[in-house]
């Protein structure tokens, strides 16, 4: 947890060889109704991402207003260095049905700006 590490003065490591999407829950809620009318099949459902975990962590810390994220978020260059870990999703199929998710960075920004969104 970024806020906790910052508040406690502790450090966390984030992998530079790992890629994963982070989806703002409100986007899931907004899109779930649309997904209910899809024909049967396998669909990836969530935010895309091109940044590694370390970059996502530092971007999120900056958006949260946490000062000098490089002092408490450390790049873990060894984890997954033998084989890059890519957990990102290709959502092009679901997008063809009008279901769109912002990328992870935009989703995090929305969550920071409007954490208790009700619309």
Predicted regions, residues:
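NAD(P)-dependent short-chain dehydrogenase/reductase
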Residues: 1-20, 25-30
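Short, amphipathic alpha-helical "lid/cap" segments that border enzyme active or binding sites
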Residues: 3, 25-36, 105-112
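Catalytic phosphate/metal-binding cores of nucleic-acid and nucleotide-processing enzymes, i.e., regions
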Residues: 10, 24-33, 41, 89, ...
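Residues that recognize and position ribonucleotide moieties
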Residues: 12, 21, 49-50, 87
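Hydrophobic residues at beta-strand termini and immediately following loops
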Residues: 14-15, 45, 104
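Conserved residues at beta->alpha junctions
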Residues: 19, 47, 98
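Mid/C-terminal beta-alpha module of Rossmann-like enzyme folds, strongest
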Residues: 31-85
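Conserved C-terminal active-site "lid" loop/helix of NAD(P)H-dependent oxidoreductases
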Residues: 52-58, 74-119
